[in-house]
């Protein structure tokens, strides 16, 4: 009996050591983000349908809609690629199709016609509590590796909202980091710079190509604008953040896509190109060589 007990104890100890070693060997999410070589910004309609493993299996970093993605779909993407999956969460505007719209409705400011949504009064404690206590935790509980925040730069057009946005971003940073997870934002090179310590990464849209909502047309950015965008990319890289770049083009624009990828890569960002509604997913990731 003593011999049997001793054998069980030895096996348990070996398994315990092996488990600890495996855990120690597994890189952190921050390390995996730093090593990511490909990126997909996939929040458009239809991006969560079909065979997600096949669609996203080659991407190291994938952003999908945090509300629409069920836990099983998050797991399917993570399992197929072994990569990171972040939940898209708009914290600077209020979208009428969200499940929390009625709760957020009292905090609406002016209407943003381009996207059919309202800027949010982030100075209001009630709005911040809604995001911090209800919306963000619900997303993280689905197994996401972190959050991807949109419209944190709304303070550029609504400067009075700066204190509230800083408080909200700081709170979200604490929320994700307490869980060992990640926080990314996008755009707002000036607005997000004072908040950079709260982020692990940032995405810059419209580096080389963008979309004009008034003309309903894609257009090429001027050389000076591209140079400024590249300067911002390098600035955030120097601060230790992972940087991605998203450009918008119509389908089958092969030459323009090459230009967008080259401009992003030359500045040090992971490139991505899609339509303005982010519905088009490339068969293969865009890579820097």
Predicted feature residues:
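Signal peptide processing junction and immediate N-terminal pro/mature segment
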Residues: 19-25
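Bacterial N-terminal signal peptides
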Residues: 7-16
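Glycan-processing catalytic domains of CAZymes
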Residues: 25-289
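Positively charged n-region of N-terminal signal peptides that target proteins for export
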Residues: 1-4
């Amino acid at each position: 009996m003593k011999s049997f007990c001793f054998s069980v104890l030895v096996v348990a100890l070996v398994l315990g050591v092996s488990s600890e070693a495996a855990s120690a060997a597994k890189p952190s999410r921050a390390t995996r983000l730093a090593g990511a070589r490909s990126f997909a910004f996939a929040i458009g309609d239809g991006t969560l349908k079909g065979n997600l493993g096949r669609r996203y299996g080659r991407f190291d970093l994938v952003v999908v809609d945090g509300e629409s993605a069920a836990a099983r779909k998050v797991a399917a993407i993570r399992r197929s690629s072994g990569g990171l999956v972040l939940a898209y969460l708009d914290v600077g505007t209020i979208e009428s199709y969200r499940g929390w719209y009625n709760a957020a409705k009292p905090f609406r400011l002016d209407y943003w016609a381009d996207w059919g949504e309202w800027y949010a009064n982030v100075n209001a404690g009630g709005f911040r509590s809604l995001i911090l206590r209800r919306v963000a935790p619900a997303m993280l509980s689905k197994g996401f590796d972190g959050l991807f925040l949109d419209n944190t730069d709304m303070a550029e057009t609504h400067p009075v909202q700066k204190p509230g946005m800083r408080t909200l971003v700081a709170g979200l940073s604490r929320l994700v980091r307490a869980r060992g997870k990640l926080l990314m934002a996008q755009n707002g090179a000036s607005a997000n710079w004072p908040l950079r310590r709260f982020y692990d990464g940032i995405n810059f849209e419209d580096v080389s190509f963008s979309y004009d909502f008034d003309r309903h047309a894609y257009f090429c950015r001027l050389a000076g604008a591209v140079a400024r965008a590249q300067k911002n990319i390098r600035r955030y890289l120097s601060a230790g953040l992972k940087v991605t770049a998203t450009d918008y083009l119509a389908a089958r624009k092969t030459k323009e896509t090459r230009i967008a990828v080259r401009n992003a890569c030359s500045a040090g960002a992971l490139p991505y190109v899609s339509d303005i509604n982010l519905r088009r997913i490339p068969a293969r990731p865009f890579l820097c060589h």
